[in-house]
């Protein structure tokens, strides 16, 4: 199914050389009822979940972008992902305003890294860009996003990756 035809407004939000960062997949033609949102972790969830014919999955994600409203997640020296939060905001708005979406699956590969000030990833609260407390930003963004989705009657599933096992 052609996800990009359904969401032409997603075009141009990633830099041209990195358009593969705009993850947009629809399981089959028709209205979706499950939305996967977050970053590339969804690319590993989508194939397995697509085996369930009872649902129609829609994946709207962006590279390295946490599944929260008005939050930019980038690597510290990264300039090409500056606008990816717009893709996430669009996906969340679609879920909230689309009555057919019943379940929202939120995932983020590096979620624990966002509260670690030593990590290469950083998180910016776009409503309050002067904020520097990563843990507070994470908690507020998570709470704000969940509040919006739950008020809209969505069931929310949050998926975390398996932890790294630190051995050779």
Identify the residue ranges that each predicted region occupies.
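Extracellular/periplasmic envelope-modification machinery, especially enzymes
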Residues: 1-168
């Amino acid at each position: 199914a052609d996800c990009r035809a359904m969401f032409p407004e997603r075009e141009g939000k990633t830099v041209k050389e990195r358009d593969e960062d705009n993850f947009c997949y629809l399981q089959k033609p028709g209205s979706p009822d499950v939305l996967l949102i977050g970053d590339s972790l969804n690319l590993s969830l989508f194939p397995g979940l697509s085996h369930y014919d009872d649902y129609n999955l829609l994946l709207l994600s962006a590279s390295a972008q946490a599944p929260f409203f008005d939050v930019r997640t980038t690597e510290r020296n990264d300039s090409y992902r500056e606008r990816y939060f717009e893709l996430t905001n669009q996906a969340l708005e679609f879920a909230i305003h689309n009555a057919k979406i019943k379940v929202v699956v939120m995932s983020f590969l590096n979620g624990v890294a966002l509260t670690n000030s030593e990590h290469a990833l950083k998180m910016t609260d776009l409503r309050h860009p002067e904020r520097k407390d990563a843990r507070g930003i994470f908690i507020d963004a998570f709470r704000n996003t969940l509040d919006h989705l739950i008020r809209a009657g969505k069931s929310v599933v949050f998926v975390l990756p398996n932890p790294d096992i630190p051995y050779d």
